[in-house]
Amino acid sequence: MTVSVEELKVLLPELAGRVLVAGAGVSGVGITQLLREMGCAVTVADSNSAQLDKLAQQTGCQTISPADVVSDGFQDYTVVVTSPGWRPDSPLLVAAQSAGLEVIGDVELVYRLDRAEVFGPKRTWMVVTGTNGKTTTTAMLAEIMQHSGARAAAVGNIGVSVADAVRTQPRIDVLVAELSSFQLHWSSTLVPDVGILLNLADDHIDWHGSFAQYAQDKAKVLAAPTAIAGFDNGHVMTETTRIQRAEDADPIIGFTLGEPAKGMVGVRDGQLIDCAFGDNVVLRSAEGIEPAGPAGLNDALAAAAAARSMGVSAVCIEEALSKFEVAGHRGQCVGRHREVVAIDNSKATNPHAADSALAGFSSVVWVAGGQLKGAEIDELIVRHAGRIKAVALLGVDRDVIEDSVRTHIPGIPVLSVSETDPRRAMDEAVAWSVSQAEAGDAIVLAPAAASLDMYTGMGQRGDMFATAIAQHLHD
């Protein structure tokens, strides 16, 4: 910290009194440690008394139950810093706002500290959000920025937390931050230098209360001086129309899989073309970008546009993307034999993500199923009826998907796996899928559903898919 405690409290008056941290989980621990290191008085509220006791021993903070905070009142506090998992309708947060107390998130707090130069000169914030593709785009952009020579790092929901990133030595100058709608909801003053909104589809509606609120929270990144948005997505276009940018602000930069107009980045004749930060500048070939298919290409276009806005050359972008390796469970090729490929896209936990995953292949043996959480599946199946040749289904909502497949793609082979043991279920699905696949086919795990009905997470689901592929996709 480059300022004294007294100077900090002048720069950020909300930290001059006692700070109430909502949540003693991973995020709450990180924020409490940060605040205590800066000399702030902190009380942490959580219903888990064991976690509170542990945190109090670690940091010396005071602790309290959420119910006691609400009953005692908020007169002792100057601000609430909430963990992103706490919903806006949580009684403590509702009561705090009703009492006139500001509620902010962990990212917003760190942003204010950075703008106040508490940890040295202000950093460059490049924020990536969207329903799908955030992690891949963030990783791509961080790779490009690092290749350009910038002291950049992927932070936020991948890499290190933003709280750690502003204190890391050697210093990180460019924060390429993947942020969720939860984090953006509680960010009232965050205006990144570059903001990217990839896409929007139904997600986390139970947390936000409505799709409109979810979309508005995501679209906060478009307040950035350099705003970049996926113009092929109808919901994104609705938000770009709704947002009133400053009169002197540059127009929003669009990226598209089609022909780019002026002020856009897109694809022409198999090449990524920049018509926003150059005059028809060829960035690289669209072929060979990982992950394969429209999703990976969209991610690369968004990352390239953001890098170009920072003055990065086309040569640097081409070199960085050529060596980029996709993270696990996001379109990773986990097997290849006799012109059959196996693709792990376990991260495709909703129909929108599965749409992009399936679109990258002309003939697919589809492995799907899990918790649909009420998501509509018919449109996805109708869209890809011409490329799906067989379907293996597992998980709690497999019958819903099976009914849709039999309605919209009658006659294709369908396996419904009733086994509930996660490893045996995946093994059965994969063994059958391999038996259905022929040269030129892709066996694609793109569940279109959440994983927690059977697996500890989408990572375990993808790992078990890869293990089963290794056992069955061979001579």
Curated annotation (Swiss-Prot):
Protein name as annotated: UDP-N-acetylmuramoylalanine--D-glutamate ligase
Record-listed ATP binding positions: G130, T131, N132, G133, K134, T135, T136
Compartments where found: Cytoplasm
Any single Pfam family the record assigns to this protein: Mur_ligase_M
InterPro entries with a match to the protein in the record: Mur-like_cat_sf (IPR036565), Mur_ligase_C (IPR004101), Mur_ligase_C_dom_sf (IPR036615), Mur_ligase_cen (IPR013221), MurD (IPR005762)
Organism for this UniProt entry: Corynebacterium diphtheriae (strain ATCC 700971 / NCTC 13129 / Biotype gravis)
Substrates-to-products reaction catalysed: UDP-N-acetyl-alpha-D-muramoyl-L-alanine + D-glutamate + ATP = UDP-N-acetyl-alpha-D-muramoyl-L-alanyl-D-glutamate + ADP + phosphate + H(+)
Family: Belongs to the MurCDEF family.
